[in-house]
Amino acid sequence: MGATTMDQKSLWAGVVVLLLLQGGSAYKLVCYFTNWSQDRQEPGKFTPENIDPFLCSHLIYSFASIENNKVIIKDKSEVMLYQTINSLKTKNPKLKILLSIGGYLFGSKGFHPMVDSSTSRLEFINSIILFLRNHNFDGLDVSWIYPDQKENTHFTVLIHELAEAFQKDFTKSTKERLLLTAGVSAGRQMIDNSYQVEKLAKDLDFINLLSFDFHGSWEKPLITGHNSPLSKGWQDRGPSSYYNVEYAVGYWIHKGMPSEKVVMGIPTYGHSFTLASAETTVGAPASGPGAAGPITESSGFLAYYEICQFLKGAKITRLQDQQVPYAVKGNQWVGYDDVKSMETKVQFLKNLNLGGAMIWSIDMDDFTGKSCNQGPYPLVQAVKRSLGSL
C-alpha cells in the first residue's frame, strides 16, 4: 500500500491498528494568542488581562522573531508583556506557557542563515534556553511555515539539537524540562516534502497541527470551500480529497507520529468569498475574497466575533458530509466553525486518542462575550467542556 495511492479507507485501516497499541491520558488544550491582537480596535483589542488562566492547559505566545541567531526583543513593552503573561501562572501553577518563533510573515527565509551551520544553530540554541529561562517560559514552539524539500533536514536537525540541549539544561536545572513543540502543516504534499516524521516524533513533545486554511480565496479556480472541514466532501476528488482534518490527522499518524503527540488545530475564524453568481453551495464560483471584517480588516477573513455579526440575517447551512457550517448573506459566503462543529471535532479527536485540541487563536473567539451572546470564549469553552479533564 504505497503512500501515493493512499485513500481515506486504507489510511484509516492502518491508523486503527496503531491506535490499539497506544494508551491515552488527560487531553491538552493548547491556545495560541497573537501579539498583534493588542493593536486591534475594540471589541477585538486583546491583552493578557483578557486571558482566563484556567481556560487552557497550554498557552503559546505568537510570534517572536530571530535576528543574528538570537530572539529579538522589539522594546521594553514586549518584556512587560512577557512578565504579564507568565504572571498568569501565579493563579494557575499548572498552566504551561510557551514562546513561538516564526509564523507566516517570518516564513522560511527567517530561519536562515541560523539553521545553515552547526555554529549558528548552537548560538541560537544557547541563547533561546537563556531567553526562555530568564522570561519564565515553559518551552518553545517552532512555527517554521514551512520547510521545503531541501530544508527538511535543516528543520529535523534543529529540532533534534534543541531537544538534546533542553534535556542537558534540565539535568543541571532545578526547574522542569523545557517543552519542545512545532506548528506543522496539514497539507499532504507539504507533510511529504517538509517533515521527517519518525525523527521528529522522537524529539518533539507534541505537534500543533495547523488543520485549517484548507480552502480560501487564493485557490485557482476560485470557488467557495470551507476553511476547516472535518471530513471529505461528497464532491471532493483527487488532491482535494486530502483537504480535510480527518485526512491530515490520519496521514500524520500513518507517517509515524504517535496519536498522543498529535494536537489537532481548530480555528476561531473563517474564510470568506464574494460570490460570482446566484449559486451559493460549496464549490460555487467566486469573484474574489469576501469583504474585510471591521476589526480584523483583512479581506477573505473573519474572526468569530465578526462572524456572529455577519450571521444576523444570513442563511446558515450545515454541511452533513464535512460536518461544519457556512453562511451566505447577499454575495458574501463564509465557512466557519461554531459550537456544534467544535464539539464534533473534539469527539473525533477523542475517538482517535489524540493528544488534545489546539486553538488558533483565542484572541479571535468572542473573548468578551459581547458579540455572540454566548458568554466569553464560547468556542474555546465548547472545546474545553467536550475534552473533559485537562
UniProtKB/Swiss-Prot annotation:
Q: Coiled-coil region(s) at which residues?
A: none
Cysteine pairs forming cystine bridges in this chain are: C31-C56
GO MF terms here are: carbohydrate binding; chitin binding; hydrolase activity
**Family to which this protein belongs:** Belongs to the glycosyl hydrolase 18 family.
> What is the source species?
Homo sapiens
Q: What is this protein called?
A: Chitinase-3-like protein 2
Record has Flavoprotein as a keyword: no
Query: A GO CC term?
Result: extracellular region
Q: Does the keyword Secreted apply?
A: yes
* InterPro entries per record: Chitinase_II/V-like_cat, Chitinase_insertion_sf, Glyco_hydro18_cat, Glycoside_hydrolase_SF, Glycosyl_Hydrlase_18
- Gene name of this polypeptide: CHI3L2
**Tissue expr:** Highest expression in chondrocytes, followed by synoviocytes, lung and heart. Not detected in spleen, pancreas, and liver. May also be expressed in developing brain and placenta.
